[in-house]
Amino acid sequence: MRIAMWSGPRNLSTALMYAFGNRADFAVVDEPFYAAYLTQSGLDHPLRSEVLADQPNDPADVIAAMLAPLPKASPHVYHKHMTQHMTAGIPREWMRDVVNVFLIRHPARVVASFAAKFENPSLEDLGFVQQAELYDYVPVSYTHLTLPTKQA
């Protein structure tokens, strides 16, 4: 199973990623489109040069890695995605090949948490606009997600 967890900033998504990372049957990938986003946007984020050096900058390479065969040791993978990283130049067709889950926190709490660190955030900075677009793009095929359990 490939889970694409979609979140905006300040949604406690890292804590959820760590929870999946503690499962022996899951591999975890943190913000795979971050370098592609930084390349396309030109934004000067903290650790920009390190991210650009460590991650693929081409969205096609990111997608190929996300859809590559899974290792036997980790039959499932959890991708933590930030909705604001999905700019217009990043293809979305691959989303039909994964289980998409949207992590949504009360907007007032997101704004308060984000505004404590950054002045005058926009809806785009918070990922709300992109999350709505991605949600509308994904076909409704699951009403809930049940993770497989080990057989006793």
Model-predicted regions and their roles:
Residues 134-142:
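A structural motif corresponding to the C-terminal end of an alpha-helix
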Residues 97-113:
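Conserved phosphate-donor/acceptor-positioning beta-strand/loop module used by diverse small-molecule
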Residues 143-149:
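Conserved small/polar residues in nucleotide/adenosyl-binding loops
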Residues 127-134:
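Active-site glycine-rich loop that binds ribose-phosphate moieties when present
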Residues 10-11, 33-35, 83-86, 107-110, ...:
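Short, solvent-exposed loop/turn segments at secondary-structure junctions
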Residues 68-88:
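Glycine-rich phosphate-binding loop used to anchor ATP phosphates in small-molecule kinases
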Residues 1-72:
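PAPS-dependent sulfotransferase catalytic core
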Residues 113-124:
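Surface-exposed cleft-lining segments at the edges of enzyme active sites
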